[in-house]
């Protein structure tokens, strides 16, 4: 009986350390994100690209991969200057007109993550990602932990 307990203790300790090593080199991926790709000569219109936002702790890169597994951007942690999280709130006018005027009292909330960085040429760039409301807090926490940069928060009420 003691041999069984010793065996279980060894298995538990080995599995604990094995799990710790796996999580340290793991890629944190967040589905249902939209990269707002700036298009046009004036760079004022954005085309949303649906995909997955990932923080790779092994290569120290933030990357966005679209639904076809084509990388949209890749940013090194060292190149990141600042990270901004925004939560916007807008009234639901269409639902108020079509369904009930009480929808004016409820607001739709959208979550955005903006990363400012310098590219290889040394010029300042930025990317904006529309986050899913289900994992927005996790993305902000992961961005802060992975990059070591403080995430600025701007929230409308």
Q: Which residues fall in each region the model found?
A:
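Short polybasic amphipathic segments
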Residues: 34-36, 60-64, 113-117
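Short acidic, glycine-rich loop/turn motifs
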Residues: 42-43, 66-68, 117-121
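Generic structural detector for well-ordered beta-strands
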Residues: 54, 74-76, 128-130
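Bacterial N-terminal signal peptides
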Residues: 6-15
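Mid-length scaffold segments of soluble, non-membrane domains
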Residues: 58-89
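Acidic, Ser/Thr- and proline-rich intrinsically disordered linker/docking segments
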Residues: 21-28, 79-157
């Amino acid at each position: 009986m003691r041999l069984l307990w010793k065996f279980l203790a060894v298995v538990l300790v080995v599995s604990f350390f094995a799990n710790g090593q796996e999580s340290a080199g793991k890629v944190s991926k967040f589905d249902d994100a939209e990269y707002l790709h700036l298009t046009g000569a004036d760079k004022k219109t954005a085309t949303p690209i649906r995909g997955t936002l990932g923080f790779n702790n092994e290569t120290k890169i933030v990357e966005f991969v679209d639904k076809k597994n084509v990388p949209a951007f890749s940013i090194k942690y060292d190149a990141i200057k600042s990270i901004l999280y925004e939560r916007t709130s807008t009234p639901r006018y269409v639902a108020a007109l079509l369904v009930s005027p009480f929808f004016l009292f409820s607001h739709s909330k959208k979550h955005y993550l903006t990363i400012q960085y310098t590219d290889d040429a040394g010029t300042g760039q930025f990317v904006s990602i529309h986050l899913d409301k289900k994992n927005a807090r996790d993305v902000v926490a992961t961005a802060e932990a992975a990059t070591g940069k403080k995430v600025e928060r701007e929230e409308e009420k």
